[in-house]
């Protein structure tokens, strides 16, 4: 077979576009232009597991950028119906000052028309400002409901707490708010600032938290001990005071944008550079300060609830075909071109010379990146050199990849629980508004809705108790607990001989059942108070009810 010359083929096609190309020539052209070139056919099979963590990261990165964008856009947005004719922010106060000045400097009061014009402009500015404020408040409320974690509204924060740094972080990061962050102790301040929005934190509290943190944090607290590359969220959210011993170096590095970007790049790659020797000697102290800009603080202050991630994913899954059709119409990419694997060879990983020889032998013939796969270990799909370096790093610090995989598994588990709780509350509201389901509805659903995506999320007992409680979730939960107690008592009584532990369990369960039955009579807006009264040397329980503060 003659050697294939692509330049000659291209020249012939340009000179005579109608020239026919043989199938053999097309096949050779395809082999030359195909980046996934095959070297040999091997009957051996490599078994591996693969999970696309990159895709999950991209989704979170998109979510972070989207949240930052919508909140920033809200700040700059002006409703179309309230765009002011006068755009000066201080115009209202300036007009009032102008009227006072005219009265003081002239003996005559300004003409009525001048005063009316000025007051009309001032009133217009005030009205437009008020309308804009009301519109922004409404939109801000909507955005916070969907994109800012609130323990009273959402099941779980999307933030993964780095509990290896702060002792109290694990217990408080999921249910605290920085608005109440007045404690000057660094451990408490750091843990209460982790999972929340800090827009409304007062200047006094912010300054106190920041100054206290800067004075008490050591360099080890600037980084996640399990993942040194990660800046803890409680550090990112604060305005850090630069320690005196770092001030001169920080000023020199941040004097120009080029200097800042160079320093940030070196910190990211941990490369040695003589001109910033001090920074490289203590990178953990410099890194959070350099990256602690207004933008990073702004982005880290809006932590979305885990509910939003799940709802977004559920929306994609539920509308996948429609989204795919729309995407194919808008963009040129094809959905069926995903991942393709080819195994070139298997060599002894302990013989680094053979590994390098293979790479350098074929690097000019392989247009795509080469990844080395270590058998029996998770493999990161990156370029040959970077993959090997990151592989060694992550296997030496396997807590990092373990945290990623654990979070991936946790996200899959919590999705079903979020959906179940949503359905439970909506069903309770439906029963309150329209009453229980018609008797034949369950038969209809079982016959015609056999492929329902939510089938089985609520048990028959939960639905029955919701109807029994007329949609009152508190009472329905109590009915569930009563059913569980009665079932446990029934199981224990069915046994012929009970052990001492089982007898104690039976007595305990009966007490819990009696207490639960009493709680059914407690109104929703009251709190039951048990009081013990001495009646002829005998203690008797009396029950009082006090008004609950809603």
Curated annotation (Swiss-Prot):
Range of residues in the leader sequence: none
Stated induction or repression of this protein's expression: Expressed in the late phase of the viral replicative cycle.
Primary subcellular site in the record, as a coarse category: host cell
Sequence repeat positions: 161-164, 165-168, 169-172, 173-176, 177-180, 181-184, 185-188, 189-192, 193-196, 197-200, 201-204, 205-208, 209-212, 213-216, 217-220
Keywords: Host cytoplasm, Late protein, Repeat
GO cellular component: host cell cytoplasm
Localization of this protein: Host cytoplasm
Annotated spans, 15 X 4 AA tandem repeats of [CNG]-[AEITV]-[DNS]-[MST]: 161-220
Domain of life: Viruses
Family according to the record: Belongs to the asfivirus B602L family.
Function: Plays an essential role in the assembly of the icosahedral capsid of the virus. Allows the assembly of 3 molecules of hexon protein p72 and formation of a thermostable trimer.
Name of protein: Protein B602L
UniProt source species: African swine fever virus (isolate Warthog/Namibia/Wart80/1980)
Record lineage: Viruses, Varidnaviria, Bamfordvirae, Nucleocytoviricota, Pokkesviricetes
